[in-house]
Swiss-Prot record:
Stated family: Belongs to the RNA polymerase subunit omega family.
Protein name per UniProt: DNA-directed RNA polymerase subunit omega
Keyword Transcription in annotation: yes
UniProt cross-references to SMART domains, sorted A to Z: RNA_pol_Rpb6 (SM01409)
Subunit structure comment from the entry: The RNAP catalytic core consists of 2 alpha, 1 beta, 1 beta' and 1 omega subunit. When a sigma factor is associated with the core the holoenzyme is formed, which can initiate transcription.
One GO term (biological process): DNA-templated transcription
EC number per UniProt: 2.7.7.6
Name of the top EC class for this enzyme: transferase
Catalytic activity as recorded in UniProt: RNA(n) + a ribonucleoside 5'-triphosphate = RNA(n+1) + diphosphate
Length: 70
């Protein structure tokens, strides 16, 4: 269970808890694969690092354009 950053703080960065979960998971996988971490924290845990990156605004997301039937 994460205590810091709080879920309330993290929810200000995204539009839903599902987006948050997906964003952190994808970034954690990138870190496991060898990407360089963007924050300087003591933890070596990829999920903790990814969560801190999202909280600091270093990792963002973009929703794809919605296409409808015309």
């Amino acid at each position: 269970m994460i205590l810091y950053p709080s879920i309330v703080d993290l929810m200000e960065k995204v539009d839903s808890k599902y987006t948050l979960c997906s964003l952190v998971a994808k970034r954690a996988r990138q870190l496991i694969a060898g990407d360089t971490k963007l924050v300087d924290i003591d933890s070596d845990k990829p999920v903790t690092i990814a969560t801190e990156e999202v909280n600091n605004g270093l990792i963002t997301y973009q929703r794809p354009q919605k296409y409808g039937i015309k």
